[in-house]
Amino acid sequence: MPLSNNQKFYIAETVEEKALCNAVRNSNVNEALSLILKLIEANQFQKFNGDLRDRDPEETYYEVYYPLLSVAVLKRNFKMFEMLLEYGFKPHAISSGLNPETTPLIEASRCGRGDMVLKLTSILNKDELNYYDKDIKNSALYYAIKNNHVNIFNVLTSMTKGVDVDFEVSMEVTIISSNFNLFIHFFYNALQGIQDEVLRKGYLLQCAASKKIYK
């Protein structure tokens, strides 16, 4: 049975929880830190910011109080962003306030925040990246290409080595972008993970042909 609108996100119950949500939205780092420490002292922090990795991924984003990490990204507040990460707000567990199916990784790429992308990818391991659908990685890559953020593009493509990536989606995004430099870079970087030389050449030929069509 589908969840009703008022069931999709738990509501912050205590004064501290509501205040923390407001502090993050208002970019008040000092107040947010003070409230987090109060939650920890009252033994409420784990309940408020539980580790959701063991839950059904299809239900995970319904079981988050508030998308605080994504809000910090959208506010471009790196200090708040770092503080939330330090206190355990997991990037794979906190969904976007605008769309519950996106993550801070996508938001950071969309906002052009290379520092945030680098920070997120440095703490995400292979298992955590594969915990969500691979479209998340491709969506982050899409925004990097669309906005011509070469540094973010480089971080994301190096991150995909050894990780299951939908190459067809990534190829299409790179081709449509009509950014030839990124197009070439992608296939000599991300496709290094394909050991079969014939398969790798096949991808390159397919993309070269597609590039001509799109031109």
UniProtKB/Swiss-Prot annotation:
Pfam families: Ank_2. ANK repeats lie at residues 64-93, 136-165. Keywords: ANK repeat, Repeat. The keyword Repeat applies. This is Putative ankyrin repeat protein RF_0783. It comes from Rickettsia felis (strain ATCC VR-1525 / URRWXCal2) (Rickettsia azadi). The lineage of its organism: Bacteria, Pseudomonadati, Pseudomonadota, Alphaproteobacteria, Rickettsiales.
